[in-house]
Amino acid sequence: QEHFLNRTKTKKLFRDVFALGRGKKWNFMHSGMFLDFLAGNQDYECTPWGMPARNIFGWQKPCYLLGEGYAKTFKELMETTDWETYGTGKYEKCANCMAHCGYEPTAANAALTNPLKAMWVALRGVRTTGPMAPEINLDKQRPAQYIFSAEVQKRLSEIHRDEAVAAKQKASTAA
């Protein structure tokens, strides 16, 4: 999180970049509504369950940027993650996040619920001037917990334990 630009700087950066292409000349692999959000024109909340990630440890809680736990199954991920405690304004680590993994799903949902707005953005391009959407209030966010390294060590220990058990079973079967 220390390497993220703050939200205002991110919005300004994207407005400057999009202004070079007059709002619609860039070929990004994201929806127009998400790009409009990056330029500060949409007021979205994070949808952390919208783009789940899986690695060798399992399904990452709540997203791949935080990795604050792992679930063995997708069902476990969805049922045991306290989704309401994550996102900008809810968790200190999420304060400056505008990443695709949480906001692209929100933008996709916005396009489905308001197709005329999505069409307008697609036709005119990303607006690069004028007022920005209001910021999310950060006053009630919970403090950050730094548990990623402990989670990785826990999972590595489980992998090593499982490998040792498998090797022991293989050796006893061969004997």
Model-derived segments and spans:
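Active-site lining segments that contact anionic ligands and/or coordinate catalytic metals
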Residues: 48-49, 94
